[in-house]
């Protein structure tokens, strides 16, 4: 489908706007995946606050210029599906990783987080980031354990002091 100049400019502006507000981006190749499966992926992405687009590589290169996702330019080869996470940095990576397990034809090319290029083989780094709630829960459990440990050490010191006296 041929796009006129205004359509191309609109696509570049839209993708650029989404990229500027995103926390991370993941690039994949969806050749060989059925339309039904892709529809399921898009639905899951919408529910997780992830924007998914299939955009021509030249337009995508222009859209990410001047953003932290410029490092992904080399990954824009062949059919490109790009996902921007706007609510949680690991959301798109987690969804794509799970989808790739179930659909071997789906290939994750690369990802970017805070201007750092992450190859598709290392997608676990981004996919395993804890959500905000998980991070708070981990912090609270660590703080509780530290307080309990301090109490135990204090009681043990008191016991030792009384035994010595």
Curated annotation (Swiss-Prot):
Some GO term, biological process aspect, for this entry: which one?
translation
Cross-referenced SUPFAM superfamilies: Ribosomal protein L10-like
Show the InterPro entries listed in the entry: Ribosomal_uL10, Ribosomal_uL10-like_sf, Ribosomal_uL10_bac, Ribosomal_uL10_bac_type, Ribosomal_uL10_CS_bac
GO function term, MF aspect, one: large ribosomal subunit rRNA binding
Keyword annotations for this protein, in alphabetical order, are: Ribonucleoprotein, Ribosomal protein, RNA-binding, rRNA-binding
Task: Keyword check for ATP-binding, yes or no.
Answer: no
The job of this chain, per UniProt, is described as: Forms part of the ribosomal stalk, playing a central role in the interaction of the ribosome with GTP-bound translation factors.
Which proteins does it associate with, and in what oligomeric form?
A: Part of the ribosomal stalk of the 50S ribosomal subunit. The N-terminus interacts with L11 and the large rRNA to form the base of the stalk. The C-terminus forms an elongated spine to which L12 dimers bind in a sequential fashion forming a multimeric L10(L12)X complex.
This chain's protein is named Large ribosomal subunit protein uL10
């Amino acid at each position: 489908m041929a796009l006129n100049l205004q359509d191309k400019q609109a696509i570049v502006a839209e993708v650029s706007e989404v990229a500027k507000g995103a926390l991370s981006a993941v690039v994949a190749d969806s050749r060989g995946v059925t339309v039904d499966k892709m529809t399921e992926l898009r639905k899951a992405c919408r529910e997780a606050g992830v924007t998914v687009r299939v955009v021509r590589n030249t337009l995508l290169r222009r859209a990410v210029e001047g953003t932290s996702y410029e490092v992904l330019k080399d990954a824009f080869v062949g059919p490109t599906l790009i996902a921007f996470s706007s609510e949680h940095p690991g959301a798109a990576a987690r969804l794509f990783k799970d989808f790739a397990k179930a659909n071997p034809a789906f290939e994750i090319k690369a990802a970017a987080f805070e201007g750092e290029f992450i190859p598709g083989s290392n997608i676990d780094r981004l996919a395993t980031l804890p959500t905000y709630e998980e991070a708070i829960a981990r912090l609270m459990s660590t703080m509780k354990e530290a307080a309990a440990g301090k109490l135990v050490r204090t009681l043990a010191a008191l016991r030792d002091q009384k035994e010595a006296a």
